[in-house]
Amino acid sequence: MSDIGQKMKIAPDDAFDADSFDKPVIGIASEMGVHDSGRHSHLRHQLLYSAAGSITIELEQALCLLPPRRAVWIPAGTVHRAIMRGVMAYRSLYFSTTLPLSDLPLQIVDVNPLFFEVIERMSFWSWEMPAAQQTSLITVFCEEMCAAHSENWTLQYPSDPRLNVWLEGLRMGELPPRLNQLSRQVGACERTIGRIFIRDTGMNYQDWRQQFRLLKAMEMLADGCHISQVAQYLEFVSDSAFIAFFHQHTGTTPGRYSGNIMPQKD
């Protein structure tokens, strides 16, 4: 392997600090598999992409799911934690804040074939590439990023301190209970909890809980779980009840969704 290839293709446990470089764009490529980045932030903007597997991104007050073949834009200074499962063809690009991208909010976007090729090429750039040689493709990237279709894979967390212990349980893998159970758990009446969720998330608790279950279902399907496993974990009374729920919220079945996000065979 060439020196350039060795520098761009890294192992999950290799030390890497994107903020130590001064080039406009720094890219890396890796086969992450299972990895937990821990909570951190960058001085640069970051774009994450993977061809297969799922990435859950925890923010201070939100949860994001990054499905395969989408990209997430993370503005500089955003504290986040990326939890990866079965991730293949992981690509991460880091952008100087001097580039015309600073107005972009955190978002998940669809990646079309041209955008993918741009991401792929930049991920394997030599870290010593002169800035002048990066200019033309950076221009294409900016055009594609600004034109990319944004998708809603984010769930806001409530910020009321009465729910902090409960939220920590969710982050540890617990499922949100029914409203009457949550009321007993946190010691607040159902009406109060409803007001908190409307105020902090724009959704009532029942809708918020359904959205949480939907994102968890998509995460598990992206990880290769069978429909029956997902239905049982999310406490549906039957596989058919889960399939109906999934179709109602996405317009497709879990089976078709899984087929569309699995790695494409050559």
Describe the role of every protein-language-model region:
Residues 179-180, 228, 244, 255:
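Residues within the helices of the helix-turn-helix
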Residues 61-76:
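Short acidic-glycine-tyrosine-enriched beta hairpin
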Residues 77-106:
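Ligand-binding loop in jelly-roll beta-barrel domains
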Residues 2-3, 15, 244-266:
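…primarily DNA-binding HTH/wHTH and HhH modules…
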Residues 69, 193, 197, 241-242, ...:
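Short hydrophobic/aromatic patch on the recognition helix
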Residues 199-239, 243, 259-266:
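Terminal helix-turn-helix DNA-binding modules in bacterial transcription factors
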Residues 1-54:
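Generic protein-terminus/edge-of-domain signal
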Residues 126-189, 199-211:
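Short, Lys/Arg-enriched, Trp-marked, Pro/Gly-tolerant hinge/linker segments that flank
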